[in-house]
A protein has these predicted regions:
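Functional-site microenvironments in short loops/helix caps that host divalent-cation chemistry
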Residues: 23-24, 29, 34, 38, ...
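Extracytoplasmic
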Residues: 51-54, 61, 78-80, 85-87, ...
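Sec-dependent signal peptide recognition
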Residues: 2-8
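C-terminal motif of bacterial Sec signal peptides marking the signal peptidase cleavage site
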Residues: 13-15
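A short alpha-helix/helix-coil micro-patch that ends at or immediately precedes a cysteine
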Residues: 95, 99-110, 191-203
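A short, compositionally biased domain-edge/stem linker segment
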Residues: 35-52
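Bacterial signal peptide processing site
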Residues: 17-19
Length: 231
């Protein structure tokens, strides 16, 4: 499967400049982690400026129970455990198409979904012995969300994600689509590496998994959703 080659995210950035000692200090922003995500990436020129907190909100620090404890949680969400979070700044909205376009225009950056697939790099992410697909299957592509006509099992993502050649942030639904008139929509078809490149340019960083879950819970305790629980 080619699905593992891409990590799709909505870019929601965390500020790295602080005006309070209680706000979490980030020594280095957007430094690629080693190991699982280690790879060579295109270097972009980093802007030198103070992070403008306009459009951001301060998330007060606190303690919360991270992870799942119900039958709908994924295996890697267990066990539920207490986590202490320092205060941090976070964008109110996801990064928009217009903001990402500015980044691309100023740096010449090319996203993962727009690049030809490097089989030698890809096969390292696949089970040993995986046969090389036909070259036509190694063309630039991305996963596109396809609504289902009825309720489906949540254990097979292929029922609502379709691998589509030519799909990228400029063409969200594939060839023939565009972001015209959607400049203020969240940018999509962005890999982890694309996100890292963007936040390095912007002088911010991605939230940690704990920060993201803490903020997403909306201040509620042990609620299933940010707006509460549903039957």
């Amino acid at each position: 499967m080619l699905f593992r080659y891409f990590v799709f995210v909505f870019l929601v950035l965390v500020g790295c400049q602080q005006n309070s000692k209680k706000v979490k200090t980030v020594a280095h922003v957007c430094t690629p982690t080693q190991g699982r995500f280690s790879t060579s990436t295109t270097t972009t020129s980093r802007q030198k400026f103070e992070v403008n907190k306009e459009g951001m909100v301060l998330i007060p620090g606190g303690t919360f129970s991270m992870g799942g404890d119900g039958d709908k949680a994924w295996p890697d969400e267990y066990p539920k455990h207490e986590v202490v979070i320092d205060s941090f700044w976070m964008d109110v909205h996801e990064v928009t198409n217009a903001e990402f376009a500015t980044f691309v225009e100023e740096t010449g950056y090319v996203t993962t979904a727009e690049k030809d697939v490097d089989w030698e790099a890809l096969k390292k992410e696949l089970p040993p012995g995986t046969a090389k697909p036909d070259d036509s299957q190694l063309a630039p592509a991305s996963l596109v969300f396809v609504p289902t006509p009825r309720s489906v099992s949540l254990h097979d993502v292929r029922q609502w994600w379709q691998w589509r050649q030519g799909a990228n942030w400029r063409q969200p639904e594939g060839p023939g689509s565009s972001i015209d008139g959607k400049e203020n929509h969240p940018v999509v078809h962005v890999s982890w590496f694309d996100a890292i490149a963007f936040c390095e340019w912007a002088g911010k960083r991605l939230p940690t998994e704990a920060e993201w879950e803490y903020a997403s819970r909306g201040g509620l305790t042990n609620a299933v959703y940010a707006w509460g629980n549903e039957n």
